């Protein structure tokens, strides 16, 4: 019998089952194929959300370049750039509306070479259609704090010319999304002057970002150059947060993301929620932007290894968001985005100056990397100058298609500019790989140099030069620690040591050459047979000990005999030319014009003055430290105390857990500790052979150089040199191994500090990538009111050329030999950070502490650094000339090659002095020749740079002229074509720069002083202040080898 209500229940169940079946039928009907509408374009009057797919692919960081490309060593990081490019191209070919941007040509060229002709043609079509866009287009995404502008230009040129040759296109957008702060030179020189329309990046100070969000000033018109002003301005897009998409819209295949589920048959159907989330996130972006366009960066580090995981989701987003209609979503690129911004006719805020220093939050200033891994930074800078000289010589003799060339060094240097390479922020094994690449490239370039010099000097060949009769021995890359076998050898029989010095600058130069020798009875002659004044300086123990350890560590050899002396002499070398010097055993009858230096170990006076020339320095005999500098010619005179200190690295404190590491500089308080007590250590004589004499201050005097040797602590030593014909002091420092303790002393950051009596009102000046100088004000930012939470680290700035302070009477200038950090923490002070050793990781991704060691067998020690900085004092307004000219000499030292041969035999078969230019011509003192490189078909890339800013010097901040006929006097010039900075397009064919409305300004473009067009008959190039001009020069090919003037 049926219970009451049972029939009613059965009827209800039937209805429910029926409804469920009906729902299932409808679900099946809605779960079929969907053609997604991805063809969206900009819609006027609507909020347009530009989706820009990208993959940020570091050219080395946690893995080496090759490991990142092929996808090996994935236990460290799952990343394979080959997979990214393979996968992206496949995805782009599936839908003509999809787009993608790629930046790093060091990776793309590797991939390109592996592709079939058919695949290459597919990619060319993708580029032509705008689906694949190259952004930046350099060899790497260069750093902006630790790179020299010449390196930045070179690596960009390398990538841009590849893109032009293979795709006949030119990048339009700078894509500097990850560097840790942004320089004014990157904006105006590697942006506007390249012909780019915009620059895009993520990292700015957290305080600056919040203010810009509130003011809707994340997008600005940036004028990075005071001299070039609005003529080199560029539209700048600062991202809302990082360079990834908004939260919830990240779709890498290996990530745990929620996919867009538009099939109602499946659990998790979420299209309505996804569209709402998209619209809401878009409005958040719109609320901090001007106009009706916002950009979403759809990608992150090494993303798109399975590109469909991204594109499938973005296809759905675009389709359903646009069906919803509240906002418009579209595939886009930075160029399309900026085109839309430009058409919108909005008025934009103005930005000047730069974006340094960068802090991503309170107590976390990214100013440590300005100095991290100083040995790598020096190697990069030294090889940069060498690369410039090697390419000049390669051009002078003509490229040897089958022999060694400079390509490998250019490739290694291009990679080294990456923002985790020269910065010193990669893992140790990756840093080792960077160094190895540089060393291999340098070795091949050295073969080019030796062969080219031998060829140029050889009198025999009339046409080309196949195999020169002479062979130079290995050049001496470890000369700074006195290791140079060519100069140390006992001269055999009637042979002399032949030293050929090449000058890559366009000016005559006089330099002091120092070589290690063992023989005290040598004579030096120049190419004219004149016996030169020279000076012997006894070899110091610090250098000898360095030599013993590092030749064993680097070369695997035990140097039994250490050289006893430095032989020092004055060398005059013509511009773009060479001179030969003959070091021979002196005859018993004649004078060798050589003076042995006098060594004074314990001065009896209260003070000791040194200086064989106009610049004098006064040292305290009691403390052993510098007290005063003055120039007897100019009258500039300051009191100055110089010492070495260390900051204790912070290991986290009550304020914040942030520690000091490879990226972050965070000292444990504001106190810097002297490396010794108030006085310099009393130590055993600094020189070999002087027994155990104790002294605080040890003086070397001679006709060419005076030196002061100081030992500040067992691990910090210094030599100060004053030259007879130079008006600056050279400080050679030796720092390390840095000892660290436990607990709160687990890291030390070493500085040198100069304390003067100058009144500087918080102001100091630092260079931007070796180019412009920018005014800095302590505890101040030009764009916002700074909340000071790190008074030391927050006042450090990057240096590539140097810094200076000034008051009403004088300027004190310091130039550096590598990228480093500098500051003026108190009025009248300059400090440079020279070395760092931190024992904790700073939680920015590298997951290693900054501890560099060098091992011999099983004995390891912390890395010792040796380097130089250069100091000058001048009357106010007169220091610019010294900074510019000396800066060029530091960047481009004399290139030296060695051989052993009979002097007369050498003279008979070789041109001992030669000039590539007209022998009566030099470049103007305000012009630098920064590129002279043979391209294909004998064409030559020529790049000239004006060295001065407007108003920097009364004589040199003017139009300067270069006569190309005299520069290339040995060849007949057929045609001169002015190019863009990266030589990827003719200057006259560059598209007109975008015009922008700027707040508070009428539309009146500035007219900086620039050079005019090159007259085809006179071939004279004009350059205005801060102008760089690039040309491709063609010659009539009558002779392969350059005609040279002989001295």
From Swiss-Prot:
CDD domains: GH38N_AMII_LAM_like. Pfam families: Alpha-mann_mid, Glyco_hydro38C2, Glyco_hydro_38C, Glyco_hydro_38N, Laman-like_dom. Its cofactor is Zn(2+). Binds 1 zinc ion per subunit. Glycans are attached at residues 280, 287, 345, 480, 508, 541, 605-606, 668, 780, 857. GO terms for cellular component: vacuole. Its main location: other. Keywords: Disulfide bond, Glycoprotein, Glycosidase, Hydrolase, Metal-binding, Signal, Vacuole, Zinc. Homodimer. This is Probable alpha-mannosidase At5g66150. It comes from Arabidopsis thaliana (Mouse-ear cress).
């Amino acid at each position: 019998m049926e219970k009451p209500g049972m029939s009613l229940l059965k009827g209800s169940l039937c209805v429910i089952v029926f409804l469920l079946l009906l729902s299932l039928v409808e679900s099946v009907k809605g779960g079929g194929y969907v053609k997604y509408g991805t063809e969206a374009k900009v819609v006027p009057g609507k909020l347009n959300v530009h989706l820009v797919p990208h993959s940020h692919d570091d050219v080395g960081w946690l893995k080496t370049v090759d490991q990142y490309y092929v996808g090996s060593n994935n236990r460290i990081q799952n990343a394979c750039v080959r997979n990214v490019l393979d996968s992206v191209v496949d995805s782009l070919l599936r839908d003509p509306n999809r787009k993608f941007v790629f930046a790093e040509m060091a990776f793309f060229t590797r991939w390109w070479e592996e592709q079939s002709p058919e695949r290459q043609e597919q990619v060319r079509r993708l580029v032509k259609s705008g689906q694949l866009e190259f952004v930046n287009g350099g060899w790497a995404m260069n750093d902006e704090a630790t790179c020299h502008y010449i390196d930045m230009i070179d690596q960009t040129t390398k990538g841009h010319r590849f893109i032009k040759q293979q795709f006949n296109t030119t990048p339009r957008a700078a894509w500097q999304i990850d560097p840790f702060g942004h320089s004014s030179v990157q904006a105006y020189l590697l942006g506007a002057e390249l012909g780019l329309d915009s620059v895009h990046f993520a990292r700015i100070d957290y305080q600056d970002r919040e203010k810009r969000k509130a003011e809707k000033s994340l997008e600005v018109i940036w004028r990075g150059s005071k001299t070039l002003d609005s003529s080199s301005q560029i539209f700048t897009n600062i991202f809302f947060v990082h360079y990834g998409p908004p939260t919830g819209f990240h779709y890498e295949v290996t990530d745990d993301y929620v996919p867009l589920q538009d099939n109602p048959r499946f659990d998790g159907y979420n299209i309505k929620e996804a569209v709402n989330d998209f619209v809401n996130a878009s409005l958040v972006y719109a609320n901090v932007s001007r106009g009706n366009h916002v950009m979403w960066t759809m990608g992150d580090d090494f993303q798109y290894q399975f590109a469909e995981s991204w594109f499938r989701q973005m296809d759905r987003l675009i389709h359903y968001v646009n069906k919803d209609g509240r906002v418009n979503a579209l595939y886009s690129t930075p160029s399309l985005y900026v085109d839309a911004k430009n058409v919108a006719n909005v008025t934009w805020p103005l930005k000047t100056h730069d974006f340094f220093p960068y802090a991503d939050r309170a107590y976390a200033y990214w100013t440590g990397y300005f100095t991290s891994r100083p040995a790598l930074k020096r190697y990069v800078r030294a090889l940069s100058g060498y690369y410039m000289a090697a390419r000049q010589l390669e051009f002078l003799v003509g490229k040897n298609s089958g022999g060694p060339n400079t390509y490998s060094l250019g490739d290694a240097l291009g990679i080294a500019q990456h923002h985790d390479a020269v910065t010193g922020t990669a893992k140790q094994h990756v840093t080792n790989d960077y160094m190895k690449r540089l060393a291999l490239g340098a070795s091949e370039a050295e073969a080019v140099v030796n062969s080219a010099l031998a060829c140029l000097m050889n009198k025999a060949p009339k046409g080309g030069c196949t195999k020169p009769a002479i062979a130079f021995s290995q050049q001496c890359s470890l000369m700074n620690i006195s290791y140079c076998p060519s100069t140390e050898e006992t001269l055999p029989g009637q042979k002399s040591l032949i030293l050929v010095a090449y000058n890559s600058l366009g000016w005559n130069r006089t330099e002091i050459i120092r070589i290690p020798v063992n023989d005290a009875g040598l004579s030096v002659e120049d190419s004219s047979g004149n016996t030169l004044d020279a000076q012997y300086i006894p070899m110091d123990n610090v250098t000898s000990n360095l030599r013993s350890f590092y030749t064993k560590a680097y070369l695997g050899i035990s140097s039994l005999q250490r050289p006893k002396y430095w032989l020092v002499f004055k060398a005059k070398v013509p511009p773009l030319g060479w001179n030969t010097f003959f070091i021979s055993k002196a005859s018993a009858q004649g004078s060798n014009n050589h003076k042995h230096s006098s060594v004074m170990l314990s001065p009896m006076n209260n003070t000791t003055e040194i200086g064989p020339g106009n610049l004098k320095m006064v040292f305290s005999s009691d403390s052993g430290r510098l007290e005063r500098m003055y120039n007897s010619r100019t009258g500039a005179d300051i009191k100055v105390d110089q010492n070495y200190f260390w900051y204790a690295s912070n290991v986290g404190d009550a304020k914040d857990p942030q520690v000091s590491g490879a990226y972050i500089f965070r000292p444990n308080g504001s106190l810097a500790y002297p490396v010794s007590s108030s006085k310099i250590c009393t130590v055993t004589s600094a020189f070999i052979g002087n027994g155990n004499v104790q002294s605080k201050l040890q003086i070397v005097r001679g006709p060419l150089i005076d030196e002061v040797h100081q030992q500040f602590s067992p691990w910090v030593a210094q030599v100060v040199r004053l030259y007879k014909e130079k008006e600056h002091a050279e400080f050679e420092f030796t720092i390390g191994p840095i000892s660290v303790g436990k607990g709160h002393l687990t890291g030390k950051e070493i500085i040198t500090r100069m304390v003067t009596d100058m009144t500087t009102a918080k102001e100091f000046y630092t260079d931007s990538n070796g180019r412009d100088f920018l005014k800095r004000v302590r505890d101040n930012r030009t764009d916002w009111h700074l909340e000071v939470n790190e008074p030391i680290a927050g006042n450090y700035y990057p240096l590539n050329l140097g810094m200076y302070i000034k008051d009403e009477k004088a300027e004190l200038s310091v130039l550096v030999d590598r990228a480093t950090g500098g500051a003026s923490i108190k009025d009248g002070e300059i400090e440079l950070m020279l070395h760092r050793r931190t024992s904790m990781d700073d939680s920015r991704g590298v997951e290693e502490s900054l501890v560099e060691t060098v091992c011999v067998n099983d004995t390891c020690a912390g890395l010792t650094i040796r380097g130089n900085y250069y100091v000058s004092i001048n009357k106010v307004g007169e220091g610019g000339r010294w900074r510019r000219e000396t800066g060029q000499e530091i960047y481009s030292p004399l290139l030296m090659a060695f051989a052993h041969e009979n002097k007369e035999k050498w003279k008979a078969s070789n041109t001992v002095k030669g000039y590539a230019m007209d022998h009566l011509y030099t470049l103007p003192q305000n012009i630098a020749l920064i590129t002279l490189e043979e391209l294909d078909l004998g064409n030559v890339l020529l790049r000239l740079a004006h060295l001065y800013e407007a108003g920097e010097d009364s004589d040199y901040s003017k139009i300067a002229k270069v006569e190309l006929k005299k520069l290339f006097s040995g060849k007949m010039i057929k045609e001169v074509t002015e190019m863009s900075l990266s030589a990827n397009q003719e200057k006259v064919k560059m598209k007109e720069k975008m015009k922008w409305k700027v707040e508070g300004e009428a539309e009146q473009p500035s007219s900086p002083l620039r050079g005019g067009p090159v007259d085809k008959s006179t071939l004279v190039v004009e350059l205005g202040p801060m102008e760089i001009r690039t040309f491709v020069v063609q010659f009539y090919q009558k002779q392969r080898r350059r005609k040279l003037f002989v001295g």
